[in-house]
């Protein structure tokens, strides 16, 4: 085990000099004793002359030149398997929930090759989420990748927590949650939410929160992914939740300049597409088992053309776009039904009825969007009878796309609803065919199935 010495410390980036014949490999882990703490460094570059440039997986405060650094001769390894369920771990797989050792039987390196093309499997099976707007407009595939896109404060994390709750309870598989650079409060809320709904023993939690150094945030997604890969390779269908994939990119940006790379567009790292690809190519389903992943993607300044969200788009099967305009109308989940897409929305996959209903809903909402200008200038009275009907139905559909969430019961005071896909299609089809033209639009707001809307109308 070779030993080197620290020669330079710049923030999270540490240069270490080793003997010429014992230079560590790229991605090898190094350990340094920093006071009472053992700090792990990960090799990023070999600079020549026996010097390697590393990123610290923790705070580099207190490091000084001349400290001894040991080469561990393997990449960062984390616990995998059933022992991780119900536990909260950090980027190195160390428990941070004060419940003692993990007691794992096996450890895996966080840097692994993606499965080969022969091993990949293609599934057409749908994953029902119980959220009307998602199941209808942008259905998820089992073993597919989903992105939740949204600016600040439109409900990415709440949507994700609802998805985890619904899928964990209805689907009863294992899940891995990687909190990448998000709020500590959300991590705490999430843990208690999982405990209260009795699904904590089916979830492994890996946190690298906002207050952590960039090294932790850059690698914590890989730690969570490695745990999910282990479950997949045991032949299970596992769910991987990443909140937030943008912070993974951002952590890369923070260390990129310190590593001496020239910035590219908007100041991002030049290796943006490659870093994203390395992560996304591993999140995939094989013939052995499947990983269904849901990733929250923060959209800076609500601009979907920003390089980070734009790079993420390319890897996804379904995109759920959360819109500030819809949130401002008080419609939650604030999913934009005209902007959200899914590869599964194909008559050969979801069936003709589902496809026609979804497209019908989109065309009515699109027509309403076009008529809004006329209404704003001339008022409703100037519309033809046919257009008045379209507007009335569109407003009902818009309200019926809202739904009370289980995880938001505390804030809204109304109990959460899980709506099956069959009921969702039936409800929207009925509105489009005019079966509910006699009901006031307020009856459709924040209800589950169409029967509830009919009941609510009686009370209004």
Curated annotation (Swiss-Prot):
Entry GO MF terms: ATP binding; ATP hydrolysis activity; proton-transporting ATP synthase activity, rotational mechanism
Binding-site residues, ATP: 150-157
SUPFAM superfamilies (alphabetical): C-terminal domain of alpha and beta subunits of F1 ATP synthase, N-terminal domain of alpha and beta subunits of F1 ATP synthase, P-loop containing nucleoside triphosphate hydrolases
Enzyme class: translocase
Function field: Produces ATP from ADP in the presence of a proton gradient across the membrane. The catalytic sites are hosted primarily by the beta subunits.
Listed InterPro entries: AAA+_ATPase (IPR003593), ATP-synt_VA_C (IPR055190), ATP_synth_F1_bsu (IPR005722), ATPase_a/bsu_AS (IPR020003), ATPase_alpha/beta_chains (IPR050053), ATPase_F1/V1/A1_a/bsu_N (IPR004100), ATPase_F1/V1/A1_a/bsu_N_sf (IPR036121), ATPase_F1/V1/A1_a/bsu_nucl-bd (IPR000194)
UniProt-annotated location(s): Cell inner membrane
Any single GO CC term annotated in Swiss-Prot or TrEMBL for this entry: plasma membrane
Family named by the database record: Belongs to the ATPase alpha/beta chains family.
Chief place where the protein resides: membrane
PROSITE patterns referenced in this protein's UniProt entry, alphabetically: ATPASE_ALPHA_BETA
Gene: atpD
Keywords recorded for this protein, A-Z: ATP synthesis, ATP-binding, Cell inner membrane, Cell membrane, CF(1), Hydrogen ion transport, Ion transport, Membrane, Nucleotide-binding, Translocase, Transport
Keyword Cell inner membrane: yes
Record membrane topology: Peripheral membrane protein
PANTHER family referenced in this protein's UniProt entry, alphabetically: ATP SYNTHASE, ATP SYNTHASE SUBUNIT BETA, MITOCHONDRIAL
EC number, UniProt record: 7.1.2.2
Name of the protein this chain belongs to: ATP synthase subunit beta
Catalyzed reactions per annotation: ATP + H2O + 4 H(+)(in) = ADP + phosphate + 5 H(+)(out)
Subunit comment: F-type ATPases have 2 components, CF(1) - the catalytic core - and CF(0) - the membrane proton channel. CF(1) has five subunits: alpha(3), beta(3), gamma(1), delta(1), epsilon(1). CF(0) has three main subunits: a(1), b(2) and c(9-12). The alpha and beta chains form an alternating ring which encloses part of the gamma chain. CF(1) is attached to CF(0) by a central stalk formed by the gamma and epsilon chains, while a peripheral stalk is formed by the delta and b chains.
